[in-house]
Structures are given as C-alpha cells and as structure tokens.
C-alpha cells in the first residue's frame, strides 16, 4: 500500500474544507433561481436570464465582495436593462421581435452600444457588477 503524498493529503483536506461552501453555493443558487423561475412562469415575464448565474455565484460565494453588494447588483442590472432599451430604441428595434438567428447591422450596433453604455455607466456611478455587462 502506498503512503499518501503530502500533495494528495493537502487536496483531500481542501476538498473537505470546500465541501460546506460548495453545498451552500449550490443550494442557495438553486433555491433563488427556482423562485425566479416560478415567478417567470406565473407572471409570464423573463425573470431568469443568463447574467443571473454569475450574480448568484458572487452573492453566495463572496457575499462581502465589492461587486456583491445590493446597491451594485440592483444598480448594475438596472443600468443594463435601461441601456438595452435605450440602444434598441436608438436603432429602431424596440418593437422588433427577438431574433437569435438573423444578425443585422442594426442589432450588432445596438448590442455594441448597449454594452458600452452599461459598462461606462457602472464605472461613472461607481456601481461595478461585472455580470450586469451581460444583462444587456
């Protein structure tokens, strides 16, 4: 029988230490996304969108982090939504149905504008929340 190497013992210890945190992040994110998913189904509104995954990770993995504060999360995503609506309106796409297959110059310009406005506004207002850049 081989003796455990210090590296292997160290990895085992780290796994034991990380397990409760991993379980917390898993459970809290599943519950929070399930609540939003249920609200989306009941209200027939898109309450679940891709940038919420990284937001949930920040909130549950590093709740005291600079990007995890309620102000940054709410303001960041709010800026992303507002920038998205503004960009769609600027390029005449506000009342156009969603189209994930046909990219036009208008859609590309709206996306570029939206991301730029979102990121710039978060810096200007000092509410950095990286996942909000994907809310656009």
Q: Where are each of the predicted segments found?
A:
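Alpha-helical transmembrane segments and their membrane-interface boundaries
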Residues: 1-96, 102-112, 118-121
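Transmembrane helix boundary and interhelical junction motifs in multipass membrane proteins
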Residues: 48-53, 129-135
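Alpha-helical architecture
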Residues: 78, 124, 130-131
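Generic transmembrane alpha-helix signature in multi-pass membrane proteins
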Residues: 88, 122-126, 135-136
């Amino acid at each position: 029988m081989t003796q455990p190497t210090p590296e292997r013992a160290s990895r085992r210890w780290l796994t034991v230490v990380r397990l409760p945190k991993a379980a917390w992040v898993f459970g809290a994110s599943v519950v929070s996304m399930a609540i939003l998913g249920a609200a989306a189904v009941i209200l027939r509104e898109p309450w679940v969108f891709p940038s919420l995954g990284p937001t949930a990770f920040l909130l549950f993995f590093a709740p005291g982090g600079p990007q995890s504060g309620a102000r940054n999360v709410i303001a960041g995503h709010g800026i992303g939504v507002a920038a998205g609506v503004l960009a769609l309106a600027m390029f005449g796409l506000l009342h156009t149905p969603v189209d994930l297959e046909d990219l036009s110059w208008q859609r590309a310009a709206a996306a570029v504008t939206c991301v730029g406005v979102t990121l710039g506004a978060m810096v200007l207002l000092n509410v950095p929340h990286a996942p909000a850049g994907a809310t656009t």
